[in-house]
UniProtKB/Swiss-Prot annotation:
Involved in pre-mRNA splicing, specifically in spliceosome disassembly during late-stage splicing events. Intron turnover seems to proceed through reactions in two lariat-intron associated complexes termed Intron Large (IL) and Intron Small (IS). In cooperation with DHX15 seems to mediate the transition of the U2, U5 and U6 snRNP-containing IL complex to the snRNP-free IS complex leading to efficient debranching and turnover of excised introns. May play a role in the differentiation of ameloblasts and odontoblasts or in the forming of the enamel extracellular matrix. This is Tuftelin-interacting protein 11. Residues 710-734 are annotated as: Required for nuclear speckle localization. One of its GO terms (biological process) is spliceosomal complex disassembly. GO terms for molecular function: nucleic acid binding. Residues 1-13, 53-64, 103-116, 217-231 have a biased composition (Basic and acidic residues). It is found in: Cytoplasm; Nucleus. Its main location: cytoplasm.
Amino acid sequence: MSLSHLYRDGEGRIDDDDDERENFEITDWDLQNEFNPNRQRHWQTKEEATYGVWAERDSDDERPSFGGKRARDYSAPVNFISAGLKKGAAEEAELEDSDDEEKPVKQDDFPKDFGPRKLKTGGNFKPSQKGFAGGTKSFMDFGSWERHTKGIGQKLLQKMGYVPGRGLGKNAQGIINPIEAKQRKGKGAVGAYGSERTTQSMQDFPVVDSEEEAEEEFQKELSQWRKDPSGSKKKPKYSYKTVEELKAKGRISKKLTAPQKELSQVKVIDMTGREQKVYYSYSQISHKHNVPDDGLPLQSQQLPQSGKEAKAPGFALPELEHNLQLLIDLTEQEIIQNDRQLQYERDMVVNLFHELEKMTEVLDHEERVISNLSKVLEMVEECERRMQPDCSNPLTLDECARIFETLQDKYYEEYRMSDRVDLAVAIVYPLMKEYFKEWDPLRDCTYGTEIISKWKSLLENDQLLSHGGQDLSADAFHRLIWEVWMPFVRNIVTQWQPRNCDPMVDFLDSWVHIIPVWILDNILDQLIFPKLQKEVENWNPLTDTVPIHSWIHPWLPLMQARLEPLYSPIRSKLSSALQKWHPSDSSAKLILQPWKDVFTPGSWEAFMVKNIVPKLGMCLGELVINPHQQHMDAFYWVIDWEGMISVSSLVGLLEKHFFPKWLQVLCSWLSNSPNYEEITKWYLGWKSMFSDQVLAHPSVKDKFNEALDIMNRAVSSNVGAYMQPGARENIAYLTHTERRKDFQYEAMQERREAENMAQRGIGVAASSVPMNFKDLIETKAEEHNIVFMPVIGKRHEGKQLYTFGRIVIYIDRGVVFVQGEKTWVPTSLQSLIDMAK
């Protein structure tokens, strides 16, 4: 902001002299800038408050400013103010308001307030300061002062390629002469006296300013100091809307939009005018004309304006303005509607073009389908013609298979969508019945397997297979097996003898991967099992020469858990046959041994404890131990059952019926001056009769250690007058040897257990990757020595069945289901392991 107001006189003019005089009366400038927050304020100092106008001002206390007041120069000559008349502020305001239009003002017509002020140099201004304004001093002697100093700047510049009299830079593009300064004529602002560019500037930067742009900028700056920047009269401004703007606007005038249904019948009372008016919809208000009231004066009809903007009302025609505005709105609406209609038609053309392309594709597809269906129909009609009895070239099963393969390969979509069941029933079934008419399954079990396998790939419905369905009306292959193949099997099973099981087992093994699972289940449950059950009821273990396991066990891979109901009557009949059995009869072991791995461990142990162990205990109790004449038959009869009965049961028999008598005989022998070498051989001979598994049992080990202790006590005592030479040493050596063998055996067992644990740890580390539930069950089965394998050709609701020991299970979403009596029961993994053991 300019500080020229500080130099104004009482009426706002700038005083020409340099006298620091300030008037205290209120001027027009003070009134106009009363509410101007940006005006320069002078804060009164303490000295001014004390002394008033007589206060002296130091140069240090002056306020900083842009142009600033200079300190009074007492050395300058005295300047006098020329007398004259000046106009008042009111007359100047009248002259400003009298201008109707803005006229170009030349720079010479500027008010004196905005012109440059001449410097009051006075007589003492040093003339030497004027010399540098020209700035034309030669540059050749640049840096000549270094001749009288120790500076090396000139030398460094010359080493870097500087040539005196030329510009700096690689290409000497720098300026040679210093930047010239130009003295402004007066004290005005920058640009007040025209261009201030020097000759050097014009040469270095030859840019010519446009006079029109300069004039426009000048007029713009000129209008800023007027009281009314817009002028007393404004030219009317017109706003034009292009069609593109209306399209971008994209809406219809609110006055012309259709009213909403819920607001179309609303009663509205208008009290904005002189009289109260009633409208029956908001749309009527929108169509109300801006007609002035007749009785009101013209001044009251105009909107109130405040301040200086309130002007006299002009010529107004509300009806005409309304009609013109209505025409404008209708035109805009028509333009927008036409644009929308055009866009809609273009979109419709694009949509119809896409529809045409789609319909063309559909038409081509339908033509291909019609062509393919025609070819398929020709092939079917050819098959039907060759199926007639009087045809000279009858259709064979191999040719029919080739026709179906062609349909499946070349016309898969039509073949998949067609009714394969009806087609196969009409063409394939008669040929298949003719093919199997002379077939005997027990003599030629593999007859027709290749043909049926080929037709399985042609007719089986994969979707029903994945869902585990057995709908005969939807699967042609299942219906073929059930209606054509199954009657031959039923017929042969009714004539089959269960004791001759090998031909039937071979037949089913050959077809188990071909026939559907539910048909195999039907054969095993409804045809085979009843025959076996009836034969088991008629079996007598005392009279039948053929062992029962020879015609029951071959069915285990196919039937597995289905044979569980037969085990109970078999055990009952075997128990009845063993009532009068003696351990000397080895035939019982031959009959029972094949059933050890078939029965569950619990049922087998219970059967042994009930029927075999008492007989063995009675036989062992009849054993007579005589070192001089020993009969070992009874002992051998008992020891032969070691693999059949558990180790704990055998050790119990030895503790109860053998070791008491054996230790008693040893004590009696030692008390009669024995030969210790014979006792040693006798001891080692009996110990060799037992297996390592029995000797490792703690009870058996304790009994033999007790015998060694008895022998050591007998040797160490002084009983008897005669002592065999070396007997004590021999017995001590024997004791040491036997104890060392026990320690070695225990160490070997511990080492084996450690190796097993290490291998198990390696397996766990290797299997640390994420596994599924089936892999976890398999790992647990390996740890507990339980057989875990899938059942071939067996599924339940599409899930694969597995055998876990003697239990049939299946896995569904991480849950194990065990086959119960009637339903499948979910169980935990630990319970499954316990049941399998």
